[in-house]
Amino acid sequence: MTLGIFRRVFLMLSVALGLTKGDLVKPSRGQLVNCTCENPHCKRPICQGAWCTVVLVREQGRHPQVYRGCGSLNQELCLGRPTEFVNHHCCYRSFCNHNVSLMLEATQTPSEEPEVDAHLPLILGPVLALLVLVALGTLGLWRVRRRQEKQRGLHSDLGESSLILKASEQGDSMLGDFLVSDCTTGSGSGLPFLVQRTVARQVALVECVGKGRYGEVWRGSWHGESVAVKIFSSRDEQSWFRETEIYNTVLLRHDNILGFIASDMTSRNSSTQLWLITHYHEHGSLYDFLQRQTLEPQLALRLAVSAACGLAHLHVEIFGTQGKPAIAHRDLKSRNVLVKSNLQCCIADLGLAVMHSQSSDYLDIGNNPRVGTKRYMAPEVLDEQIRTDCFESYKWTDIWAFGLVLWEIARRTIINGIVEDYRPPFYDMVPNDPSFEDMKKVVCVDQQTPTIPNRLAADPVLSGLAQMMRECWYPNPSARLTALRIKKTLQKLSQNPEKPKVIH
């Protein structure tokens, strides 16, 4: 069959080039044109004919060949359509065939299958389109549901599963910190999601111990153990989600970081509540503690050292399978530092925290419209000069705020029988609820810092604490101390401490 095709092609070529007999067209002498002649039968590079021809032929196993010549026979070949083997072109001006390029039809693989019904595409088209739309809709719905479940920490119902919790010996934690080894999530940062839901549903709220613009804090009871339940307001959902995300993905088990137990979205009194359940510390926040108590120097150092240890743990990146990214708090203040029963501090409220990993160089800022506390904002934040794409910038703002927390501790420390009432930083320079502009004028324009009590110079240990505050408040952020340096310096100042006492 293939041989027959090539015989026909050769015949057409011969006829086209005037090499065979056919229906003779007898043009007048005036109709003859000069043509380029490039084929095996040419005696000269120029020939004369009624028209010029170009024939592109592909023979089996060979590249397509181009033949040029004159035509005077079988003019109907000029009207033929190109095929996958031959393409014939005619023109009627002298040398019009010299630079003509032709193409063959695309090669078609012979098939012995019956021809497809012409109506089949009309039937299959709408069906396939419908299937694609259904698949895309299903995929979109699945992704939306998955995102919602991830935000709420709801992956399925566990029911009333039996739990085996082991009590922790650290601090005054009332609930077990860890599940048995074969039931942990691997993060060491809390209970698995499903267990968290069960714990949350078994917690009974006992009394409200604090309120703020972003929610309430309750003392709760779980199987006779006291827990703290932070109930977020609906407008602060992103803080709840962010804190839940960090606790569930980062290794944050540390004596000086508030112990996380569970997080859940629950319904109480026909309204949705966002719960964050943590260890309960009866002394409350450092802010509350300092208003009630005065401090001996060694207790002041104990509070300062433990808070610095917590901040240093947040700021450092730990590598390895049990590692953690570096974290900047972004809302450090005495209200977000809790006092444990052993008179050590632990840092709480990670709703604005920023995470950074050196290996991926990824800065995870989160998606929280809430801003930090204006009274504790560093000058570069107030004048909007902070580099938001640089993780170190966020750590430097934490150091500024930590210096203010140290100042609050120092005011309540007894030296030579003298102590001052508790006051918040800049109490004598701005209103009780300062605006952004109030703080910007005091800190950036007037370049003021809280007044350090002169009596600190009378104590060799607390004079070192006073110097540390000044180094936390440098206007140049990069010149401030690091959390690790603060921790080591405070530990050195508190060598050979006496047993701390609370003075009423």
UniProtKB/Swiss-Prot annotation:
Catalytic activity: L-threonyl-[receptor-protein] + ATP = O-phospho-L-threonyl-[receptor-protein] + ADP + H(+); L-seryl-[receptor-protein] + ATP = O-phospho-L-seryl-[receptor-protein] + ADP + H(+)
UniProt keyword list: Angiogenesis, ATP-binding, Cell membrane, Disulfide bond, Glycoprotein, Kinase, Magnesium, Manganese, Membrane, Metal-binding, Nucleotide-binding, Phosphoprotein, Receptor, Serine/threonine-protein kinase, Signal, Transferase, Transmembrane, Transmembrane helix
Any Pfam family the entry gives: TGF_beta_GS
Locations listed in the record: Cell membrane
Signal sequence segment: 1-20
Chain segments carrying region Mediates specificity for BMP ligand: 74-77
Glycan attachment points: 34, 99
Extracellular side: 21-121
One GO-annotated biological process of the protein: wound healing, spreading of epidermal cells
Name of the protein: Activin receptor type-1-like
Originating organism: Rattus norvegicus
